Regions:
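C-terminal catalytic histidine-bearing segment of alpha/beta-hydrolase fold enzymes
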Residues: 254, 300, 305-344
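Mobile cap/lid helix-loop segments that gate and shape the active-site cleft of serine hydrolases
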Residues: 174-175, 190, 230-271, 276, ...
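N-terminal cap/lid segment of alpha/beta-hydrolase-fold proteins
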Residues: 60-100
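Short beta-strand/loop motif that positions the catalytic acidic residue
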Residues: 281-283
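Gly/Ser-rich "nucleophile elbow"/oxyanion-hole loop immediately N-terminal to the catalytic nucleophile
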Residues: 167-211
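Cap/lid segment of the alpha/beta-hydrolase catalytic domain
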Residues: 110-186, 242-245
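C-terminal segment of N-terminal export signals and the immediately downstream linker at the start
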Residues: 3, 24-45
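N-terminal export signals
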Residues: 2-4, 9-29
């Protein structure tokens, strides 16, 4: 991205053009979708981006810095520092399978919150009790996978008290006209730019995947960026009104709250921007973060749209008998979905 670019120039010459004007990309993805629906998605996608505060669209990223390369069983792990936003460097890990296609599918693995501010991107390799590590599985499937530290997490945790650091970041950004969640999503979007540009990656096969906070960010990213051909989210397809009704606002971190969002969007409205691309969502029926009635409401809104465009098999929204955890049977569904929609 050369020279002194205006925001308009930037949008025309980078991946942001796809996210800001996604109808053309979506039309290319599926001839089944009609033009009025695609045009509405384009308009609403721009509106959704507009709620995320002042974003550094004009920032010209510096080249990534390779910190180290680690040899693991079945994959090489590159440790990187990416320049995504111009405000602070973003540590990242890139998993490159040793056995893969010349142009392999790419996946953005988005870490969770759970108050584990020291974990961040390392969740990909280490896993957590509620979700065992995905690195070996993704390596076996030949999926090139990128994970970054979100604002306030991992190597971007700047306060000893991580929760206080998150609150301070939220408040300071509000003063500056920014939104913490907006800056988080901008980083994930820019990370997708980097992943799509890697020589190992087939940019026509890109996915987003995460649990909890990572789940929320996965479906938001798929809504904001039509390059995401496969969205997989675990334990956080949360209907906002149902969250209010069940008095569960306290269960989500401060990062989650976007000013004025409910004046313009409900959860189903955001997820409608993913149609007709592949979307898998698995959730716990006993998870207070994701009230089951809300999951069912979203499913009942989306499934008729997928059915209308002949893509019913490309949307699956399920509830399992569990709390905030990925069950083995949920993982089985996820891996089958990866094989069919991303690898195959």
């Amino acid at each position: 991205m050369p020279g002194e670019f205006s925001r308009r120039d930037f949008l025309q010459t980078s991946g942001a053009a796809l996210a800001a004007a996604g109808s053309s990309s979506l039309a290319n993805h599926s001839n089944a979708i009609d033009e009025p629906f695609a045009a509405r998605q384009e308009r609403r996608r721009k509106e959704l981006w507009g709620l995320l505060g002042d974003l550094p669209w004009n920032h010209r990223p510096e080249p990534p810095r390779l910190v180290s390369r680690e040899d693991h069983d079945g994959y090489v792990l590159e440790r990187l520092v990416l320049d995504l936003n111009g405000q602070e460097p973003v540590p990242a890990v890139l998993l490159i399978p040793k056995k893969r296609a010349e142009r392999a599918p790419g996946l953005l693995f988005i870490h969770w919150h759970a108050g584990m501010y020291d974990l961040g991107k390392e969740q990909l390799v280490r896993g957590v009790k509620a979700q065992p590590a995905y690195a070996p599985v993704l390596a076996e499937k030949g999926i090139v996978t990128l994970a970054i530290d979100s604002w306030c997490f991992g190597e971007r945790k700047h306060e000893q008290d991580g929760g206080q650091g998150e609150q301070d970041a939220f408040k300071l950004m509000l003063w500056r006209g920014q939104v913490l969640y907006g800056m988080m999503m901008f980083d994930e979007f820019r990370a997708m730019d980097y992943l799509a540009g890697r020589p190992e990656v087939d940019a026509s096969r890109l996915g987003a995947f995460g649990m909890s906070m990572g789940s929320t960010k996965a479906w938001w990213l798929a809504a904001l960026d039509p390059r995401v051909k496969v969205c997989m989210d675990v334990c956080c397809l949360t209907d906002y009104e149902e969250l209010i009704r069940t008095h569960a606002l306290k269960d989500h971190g401060i990062y989650y709250y976007v000013p004025a969002l409910l004046k313009h969007f409900q959860t189903a409205d955001i997820n409608e921007l993913i149609v007709p691309r592949a979307h898998l969502s698995v959730n716990g029926r006993r998870d207070p973060l994701t009230p089951p009635a809300g999951v069912e409401k979203i499913r009942d809104r989306l499934m008729p749209l997928y059915r209308e465009y002949g893509k019913e098999e490309d949307c699956r929204i399920e509830l399992f008998d569990c709390e905030h955890v990925e069950l083995p049977e949920m993982r089985k569904v996820i891996l089958e979905w990866m094989d069919r929609e991303l690898v195959g």
